[in-house]
Amino acid sequence: MDLHRAAFKMENSSYLPNPLASPALMVLASTAEASRDASIPCQQPRPFGVPVSVDKDVHIPFTNGSYTFASMYHRQGGVPGTFANRDFPPSLLHLHPQFAPPNLDCTPISMLNHSGVGAFRPFASTEDRESYQSAFTPAKRLKNCHDTESPHLRFSDADGKEYDFGTQLPSSSPGSLKVDDTGKKIFAVSGLISDREASSSPEDRNDRCKKKAAALFDSQAPICPICQVLLRPSELQEHMEQELEQLAQLPSSKNSLLKDAMAPGTPKSLLLSASIKREGESPTASPHSSATDDLHHSDRYQTFLRVRANRQTRLNARIGKMKRRKQDEGQREGSCMAEDDAVDIEHENNNRFEEYEWCGQKRIRATTLLEGGFRGSGFIMCSGKENPDSDADLDVDGDDTLEYGKPQYTEADVIPCTGEEPGEAKEREALRGAVLNGGPPSTRITPEFSKWASDEMPSTSNGESSKQEAMQKTCKNSDIEKITEDSAVTTFEALKARVRELERQLSRGDRYKCLICMDSYSMPLTSIQCWHVHCEECWLRTLGAKKLCPQCNTITAPGDLRRIYL
């Protein structure tokens, strides 16, 4: 297309100032004058088209009217003063066969303006015509006309000055390869490169022309539409096979993911959701993006499916329980109906109501008059089946000897409390003597070793306390009171003993304290009824006032106390 466009520009430029100077008029004139004189052959030069690169704009030094064919051709000396003896490439003088018959006379072409700026000139003599080669023979390539390394076209004028057409590009870039191939094909089509490439067989020439024409119309380097990579013509087949292999691997990878998800034991809900997701995928999405999205959302989607499967499992379990309950109720109703039918049949056979005697008189039971008997009255009848555990003996005494060992404390070990009134004290002593059956009281705790300064009862959870709580003393000051105030040395020793005791308590940490005396345990006891732990004296004084635990008010006997070791 560029060749025709260049030729069109040359026809309408200053080379042909006369509008009649066109190839069509030239043919008409030459055919009209062919019958006059056919002795002188003539070659008709075609309009000169400058080969121009496809992608690059180059500088053309002869686009104005000052340059004529005479300034570019060599060895033309027939016209004195206008053309000098110059050599020029004969490939520029290619003629079409229909325009140059062998017996054509070129003398009438003088009507097409033979001035110094015309594009068509007659040859002066026979030597000039014979000095040129035929336009249909392979042309010889001049020196510096075509370089294999750089596709540049050079011409020289009469002064020996060379003109370079084309731009030099780096040979390593794709653009240079494209320009090289395109320029080479353009020059070959226009006849500028006409050595062994032009001197081939007709079949090779036809194939080469097809390839060159395709290259002229599609001169851009191919680009992969998938990965947008610039490719060379030799890499097209290999790259296409690589893309096809990647495309074939995508369905297999997707099927493997689905097979992993559809492992044995997968619930139906998971299979259904996977199929819905597979159907809902966009058909226009690319395989790469779909695979990336599946991998990106696989974790969250698996979590969603697991939660939904667990929820459906719970719902199915509830439904199964409800069905079992309904079946059990149906069986019970069936058995009840069978019993009712049996009773009705029996009553119908007997044709009498239930009778009983009361005070020597026979009476009819009123419930038998109701339809359905006692069950029809709305009361619930209990089954006659007895529980097999109902015959077990009930242990009222609570013999825990085998489990907890023999009792360690008795009623004689209890420390009785003294009331404010003498009458209450006498009653307590009488009751205690009756319980002991005249036995002597225990001497486990003597008043001198008692932690309590008086016989007042400690406070319990019921709020019962003595009015002299301010006078109560704990084990912290009991040792000091035992010592007489007359001896200063004894007091000093007692203080040192107290300090050592406090140091031991600090070293132990005193993590365990009695909740009654608020001191560390002297002899801890626990009850097998409530398992609360208190000091021995605290337990015995509390049980002397009431048979209840001082912490939780659980009924506790002296025989329930057991010694423990912390």
Curated annotation (Swiss-Prot):
Keyword field: Cardiomyopathy, Coiled coil, Cytoplasm, Deafness, Disease variant, Isopeptide bond, Leukodystrophy, Metal-binding, Nucleus, Phosphoprotein, Transferase, Ubl conjugation, Ubl conjugation pathway, Zinc, Zinc-finger
Instruction: Provide the reaction this enzyme catalyses.
Output: S-ubiquitinyl-[E2 ubiquitin-conjugating enzyme]-L-cysteine + [acceptor protein]-L-lysine = [E2 ubiquitin-conjugating enzyme]-L-cysteine + N(6)-ubiquitinyl-[acceptor protein]-L-lysine
Residue numbers of Phosphoserine PTMs: S390
The record places the cross-link (Glycyl lysine isopeptide (Lys-Gly) (interchain with G-Cter in SUMO2)) at K277
Q: SUPFAM superfamilies given for it? A: RING/U-box
Write down the Pfam families for this protein, in alphabetical order.
RNF220 (PF15926), zf-C3HC4_2 (PF13923)
Give the residue ranges for region: Disordered: 277-297
GO MF annotations in UniProt: beta-catenin binding; ubiquitin protein ligase activity; ubiquitin-protein transferase activity; zinc ion binding
Q: Which InterPro entries match?
A: E3_ubiq-ligase_RNF220-like, RNF220_mid, RNF220_RING, Znf_RING, Znf_RING/FYVE/PHD
Q: What Gene Ontology terms describe where this protein resides (cellular component)?
A: cytoplasm; glutamatergic synapse; nuclear lamina; nucleoplasm; nucleus; postsynapse; protein-containing complex
Q: Where is this region: Required for targeting to the cytoplasm?
A: 514-522
Major place of residence: cytoplasm
Q: How does it assemble?
A: Interacts with SIN3B. Interacts with CTNNB1 (via Armadillo repeats 2-8). Interacts with USP7 (via MATH domain).
- UniProt disease link: Leukodystrophy, hypomyelinating, 23, with ataxia, deafness, liver dysfunction, and dilated cardiomyopathy: An autosomal recessive neurodegenerative disorder with systemic manifestations. Affected individuals show delayed motor development and ataxic gait in early childhood that progresses to spastic paraplegia with loss of ambulation in the first decades of life. Additional features include progressive sensorineural hearing loss, hepatic dysfunction, and dilated cardiomyopathy. Death occurs in the first or second decades.
Q: What does this protein do?
A: E3 ubiquitin-protein ligase that promotes the ubiquitination and proteasomal degradation of SIN3B. Independently of its E3 ligase activity, acts as a CTNNB1 stabilizer through USP7-mediated deubiquitination of CTNNB1 promoting Wnt signaling. Plays a critical role in the regulation of nuclear lamina.
Q: Report what the protein is called.
A: E3 ubiquitin-protein ligase RNF220
Q: Which organism is it from?
A: Homo sapiens (Human)
Annotated gene: RNF220
